[in-house]
Curated annotation (Swiss-Prot):
Species assigned in the record: Mycobacterium sp. (strain KMS)
Protein name: Ribonuclease P protein component
Reactions accelerated catalytically: Endonucleolytic cleavage of RNA, removing 5'-extranucleotides from tRNA precursor
Gene: rnpA
Keyword Transcription regulation annotated: no
UniProt keyword annotations, A-Z: Endonuclease, Hydrolase, Nuclease, RNA-binding, tRNA processing
Subunit (UniProt): Consists of a catalytic RNA component (M1 or rnpB) and a protein subunit.
Gene3D superfamilies reported for this sequence: 3.30.230.10
Gene Ontology terms: biological process: tRNA 5'-leader removal
An example Gene Ontology CC term for this record: ribonuclease P complex
UniProt family annotation: Belongs to the RnpA family.
InterPro entries membership: Ribosomal_Su5_D2-typ_SF, Ribsml_uS5_D2-typ_fold_subgr, RNase_P
Enzyme Commission number: 3.1.26.5
Biological role stated in the UniProt entry: RNaseP catalyzes the removal of the 5'-leader sequence from pre-tRNA to produce the mature 5'-terminus. It can also cleave other RNA substrates such as 4.5S RNA. The protein component plays an auxiliary but essential role in vivo by binding to the 5'-leader sequence and broadening the substrate specificity of the ribozyme.
GO molecular function: 3'-tRNA processing endoribonuclease activity; ribonuclease P activity; tRNA binding
Amino acid sequence: MLPARYRMTRSTEFSTTVSKGVRSAQPDLVLHMANVLDDPSGPRVGLVVAKSVGNAVVRHRVSRRLRHSVHPMLDELQPGHRLVIRALPGAASATSARLHQELSAALRRARPRVEASA
């Protein structure tokens, strides 16, 4: 489970991160990452798992796998970093290891671009 202080809950946080952040696409997910300098409360993560991924059981399984994958990465993030992870339909059939690998690759690609734009 992702601790509450790391969770994105407001729609404004999601929309700001998606619109102003950098995007890094992988086959089964898309990562949007932004750096919010005026809020040093810690890195925050939001998940978007649409109905196109599958029924409620499948969507919840994908969400759990993504939360589990992002949890160890929180220590590597700066306090102002905001992440929105959008699962694509292929995430339903992807293994946990594959989702973790894709998330790591997306984060590796996005982080230098976010830090350069800050």
